[in-house]
Amino acid sequence: MLFRSLGAFFTLVSLPVMLAVAIGIKLTSPGPVLFKQNRYGLNGKQIPVWKFRTMRVMENSAVVTQATRNDPRITRFGAFLRKTSLDELPQFFNVLQGTMSIVGPRPHAVAHNEQYRLLVENYMIRHKVKPGITGLAQIHGFRGETDTIDKMEKRIQYDLEYIQSWSLLLDIKIVFLTFFRGFVGKNAF
């Protein structure tokens, strides 16, 4: 309940920024402002996760291709949004809906989830808690593209560590560190 209240607070505070981002997207590329992708949430239930659109509108495909550094699909304004993590702001609406938390393991696209559950031991344990906008893995530099199994295994290790050692103090620490490490970093693109 505390984090839902904080989600409401952050949503209200970020509304002017969200409006500016929405205008920026509309002025710089055709297509919708928001992008919705199904991901797995608590107990492996599929949930729609909202983000600001950072890529050119392409045909809808069942194949989900991860964005990569210098990906030609990413717009110039979209690159800025990704670098600063402003593309994640609509996920506060997911927090208000109760499908996400501010802190928790980041939700992965359904196609990626199906792939990694077969390759990474204990992968599915991460669905024992609500997914988050930020998490322990993100403040340790694991955000953006996961182009190797080794990177995904390390990311999952942080997710499992978070679940095993959860506390309100840990969540506060992660939120605090997200502002200094998570939003802008070498792995952000």
Residue ranges and their predicted role:
Residues A67-K130, I174-G182:
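A short, structured surface patch at a secondary-structure boundary
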Residues A8, P32, L42-K45, A79, ...:
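Gly/Ser/Thr-rich helix-start
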Residues S29-P32, R69-P72, V95, P131, ...:
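A generic fold-level signal
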Residues F35-R73, T134-Q157:
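Short, glycine-rich, amphipathic interfacial segments at transmembrane boundaries or analogous
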Residues V21, F35-K36, V103-P105, A111, ...:
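Short, hydrophobic secondary-structure boundary micro-motifs
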Residues V13, N70, R82, S165-L168:
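Aromatic-acidic/polar surface patches that form glycan- and anion
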Residues M1-E59, N94, L168-F189:
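A hydrophobic, helix-centered structural microdomain
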Residues N122-F189:
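C-terminal terminal-structure detector
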